[in-house]
Amino acid sequence: NFRQLHSILQGHPDCKKVPGVDASTGSLGQGCSIAVGMALGAKVQGKDTKVFTLLGDGECQEGQIWEALMSAAHYKLDNLTVIVDNNGLQIDGSNEEVMSLGDMPAKLRVFGFDLHEIDGHDLDAIEAALGAPVTPGRPKAILAHTVKGKGVSFMEGQVGWHGKAPNEEQRQQALKELED
């Protein structure tokens, strides 16, 4: 089903098909802005609601992301958690080659986020970061250091697998390698 038209995992999340996805977005950073709006709306309405958004480090080259992050801190959205998949790669190459993000942890801290840096492949670390106490008045950022395609020999660290679906033989090999 991955990367096939009309499937639940056709590419970018489709809120009409994927349970738990509240907005259909692409790779242009809209998700963070939508999440900020949802978190702010919940605050204004007095709702005890937590909002989570997942970003790729490559999309953090979009200006809209930084405007959303500034707004989250400005409005003291302590009901917002931003998770950044920090794998260093995007569709066109490495982030360093395309446009360096510089010191991402420092940027998130300066923007007013309560930052948790983790190994994004460590489920215990993910659970601990998600469950860490909220700092009143500060949004939370989880910078998850990952390797694209981790655990699959022909995918690991390879830009070409950004949005490509494996054929049946590759799928079987990937599943075997992940099980081992």
Positions of predicted regions on the chain:
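Histidine/lysine/aspartate-rich catalytic loop segments that bind and position anionic ligands
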Residues: 75-101, 105-108
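Short, conserved beta-strand edge motifs with alternating hydrophobic and charged residues
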Residues: 51-55, 81-85, 117-118, 143
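A short alpha/beta connector and helix-capping loop motif
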Residues: 62-87, 141-144
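Short acidic, glycine/serine/threonine-rich loops at helix termini
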Residues: 14, 64-66, 92-96, 152-157
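Cofactor-binding active-site loop characterized by glycine-rich and histidine/acidic residues
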Residues: 1-74
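Short coil/turn segments at beta-strand junctions that form active-site/ligand-binding loops
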Residues: 47-50, 78, 137-139
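Glycine/aspartate-rich loop-and-adjacent alpha/beta segment that forms the canonical ThDP
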Residues: 123, 128-180
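Conserved thiamine diphosphate
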Residues: 46-49, 96-129, 179
